[in-house]
Every structure is written in C-alpha cells, then in structure tokens.
Amino acid sequence: MRELYLVIAYDTPDDRRRARLAKLLKGFGERRQYSVFEARLTREQWAHLKGKLEALVNKEEDVLAVYFLPPEAVGRTWRIGHEGLKRLEDPDFV
C-alpha cells in the first residue's frame, strides 16, 4: 500500500482551536513550524484525520491547507536548522 506524504498548514484566530489542531496533528505527523506539520499516512489514516479536521475547523474563521507530495518529492526535501529534524536526502539539483 502506498503511503501519502502530506504537508498540513493552518491558521485560526481562536487559541483553543489552534491548540486542539496542534494536538490532533501531533498524533499523525511531525511539527515543522508553529502551524505546519508533515505526515506520512496510509489512506485509512488520512480518511480518519480528514474527518477529524472537518469537524474541528471553523470554515468561516480558519484556513487549513493540505498539500499532497509525490513520493519522489519527499526524497528531494532540503531543510536547514533544528538538528533534531531528519534530512530525507541531500539533493544537488537546480
């Protein structure tokens, strides 16, 4: 079964909802920035997470975006900073 590679970013003016979103997403992926997470999920896990996100997000006040990355793009990820973060590969491409 192919895994899905996701980048999830959100913004909400509500502190309580922001904390709940962070707690939910920590259970599915790794925090990369304050409101940005990366996740590697099965389709079943994604369906479960999607349902929880739809129930939590206020469509009138919040913004949440999920970016689906192809597997080959994940191997070409480049990051600087935070020693604890894993570098997936060190690409030399333009």
UniProtKB/Swiss-Prot annotation:
Cofactor names: Mg(2+)
Q: What is the similarity comment for this entry? A: Belongs to the CRISPR-associated endoribonuclease Cas2 protein family.
This chain's function reads: CRISPR (clustered regularly interspaced short palindromic repeat), is an adaptive immune system that provides protection against mobile genetic elements (viruses, transposable elements and conjugative plasmids). CRISPR clusters contain sequences complementary to antecedent mobile elements and target invading nucleic acids. CRISPR clusters are transcribed and processed into CRISPR RNA (crRNA). Functions as a ssRNA-specific endoribonuclease. Involved in the integration of spacer DNA into the CRISPR cassette.
Q: Annotated Gene Ontology MF terms?
A: metal ion binding; RNA endonuclease activity
Underlying gene = cas2
Q: Which UniProt keywords apply?
A: Antiviral defense, Endonuclease, Hydrolase, Magnesium, Metal-binding, Nuclease, Plasmid
Query: Key word Ion transport present in the record?
Result: no
**Which biological process, per GO, is one annotated for this protein?**
defense response to virus
Instruction: Report the enzyme's class at the first EC level.
Output: hydrolase
Taxonomically, the superkingdom here is: Bacteria
What EC number(s) does this enzyme carry? 3.1.-.-
What does the subunit comment say? Homodimer, forms a heterotetramer with a Cas1 homodimer.
Query: By what name is this protein known?
Result: CRISPR-associated endoribonuclease Cas2
Q: Which organism is it from?
A: Thermus thermophilus (strain ATCC 27634 / DSM 579 / HB8)
The residues the record assigns to binding Mg(2+) are: 11
What InterPro entries has UniProt attached to this entry? CRISPR_associated_Cas2, Virulence_VapD/CRISPR_Cas2
Q: Which Pfam families match?
A: CRISPR_Cas2
